[in-house]
Amino acid sequence: MENKYTHGVLFYHEHSGLKNINQGIGEVTTALSSICKHLSIQLSENEGDIIKYCQEIKAKDYAKDVDILFILGGDGTVNELINGVMTHDLQLPIGILPGGTFNDFTKTLNIAPNHKQASEQMISAQVGTYDVIKINNQYALNFVGLGLIVQNAENVQDGSKDIFGKLSYIGSTVKTLLNPTQFNYQLSIDDKTYSGETTMILSANGPFIGGSRIPLTDLSPQDGELNTFIFNEQSFSILNDIFKKRDSMNWNEITQGIEHIPGKKISLTTDPTMKVDIDGEISLETPIDIEVIPNAIQLLTVNDL
């Protein structure tokens, strides 16, 4: 078949989440090499390496003809590539191959959860343009959260149960995570202010978090808006119901315990200072400034049949 691209670069981490990364690389290169005249396979040994490679690609120091990027890994690895591409203004399409515990954004792109199947989908995938979240000086595709979602991420890092990864059980599981940290917040969304006490705040770009779909029909990473959710202390009992529902439901029918505010620019301060989860990576603390950057990134997308 005719090669679509001149030179593709496939990034991966040794600890990508696949049991055998070398076998995984072999399984995906068959399809990728069929759409690229030249395919480079680039190991990222340390955190931050992918961002450095993006800088080299922009300066034409890596190679002069790179015209597509691929990433094999989980949400954290994907997040590093997104930061590299945005920081160095690389106007190149990206193909995401799932290789970690969760790949929430690949669901949005209709990409198969299996890396080999995903690589085969790249052959016919089309380039779509998507919004990106900017958080202070970092970037993310999917979400920004604090409160309970950070406690969950820290539990996962400790090898404990991922409650957000099994949202169908969250109603009962969250009771084992008793007394989640309450915090005071001051929130500004498009110049409107909100304040109060909560246990979790979430700003979403994509419709999937923790493998489950947020039940809002109009939530899209291509609409130039973010969706912020403020959870009150009573809302845990209804989280289970929310994430079991179909995505066609009306948000207002399910709860008054979760406030939903769409917007483009967000400023958030808390008391006490809170850690912030960005696409599964805990790398910032409040206060934070968040904004949506419309049509910022090109991602290979599988047509929804």
Curated annotation (Swiss-Prot):
InterPro entries: ATP-NAD_kinase_N (IPR017438), Diacylglycerol/lipid_kinase (IPR005218), Diacylglycerol_kinase_cat_dom (IPR001206), Lipid_Phosphate_FormReg (IPR050187), NAD/diacylglycerol_kinase_sf (IPR016064), YegS/DAGK_C (IPR045540)
EC number: 2.7.1.-
Coiled-coil segments: none
Cofactor descriptive note: Binds 1 Mg(2+) ion per subunit. This ion appears to have a structural role and is required for catalytic activity.
Active site (record annotation): 281
Residues reported to bind ATP: 44, 74-80, 101
GO cellular component: plasma membrane
Gene3D superfamilies: 2.60.200.40, Probable inorganic polyphosphate/atp-NAD kinase, domain 1
Domain DAGKc: from-to ranges: 3-139
Any single GO BP term: phospholipid biosynthetic process
Keywords from the UniProt entry: ATP-binding, Kinase, Lipid biosynthesis, Lipid metabolism, Magnesium, Metal-binding, Nucleotide-binding, Phospholipid biosynthesis, Phospholipid metabolism, Transferase
Pfam family, one: DAGK_cat
Any one Gene Ontology molecular-function term assigned to this protein's record: ATP binding
Cofactor(s) recorded in Swiss-Prot or TrEMBL: Mg(2+)
UniProt: Mg(2+) binding residues: 220, 223, 225
Entry-linked SUPFAM superfamilies: NAD kinase/diacylglycerol kinase-like
Function: May catalyze the ATP-dependent phosphorylation of lipids other than diacylglycerol (DAG). In fact, is not able to exhibit diacylglycerol kinase activity in vitro.
Similarity comment text for this entry: Belongs to the diacylglycerol/lipid kinase family.
Protein name: Putative lipid kinase SAR0780
Organism for this UniProt entry: Staphylococcus aureus (strain MRSA252)
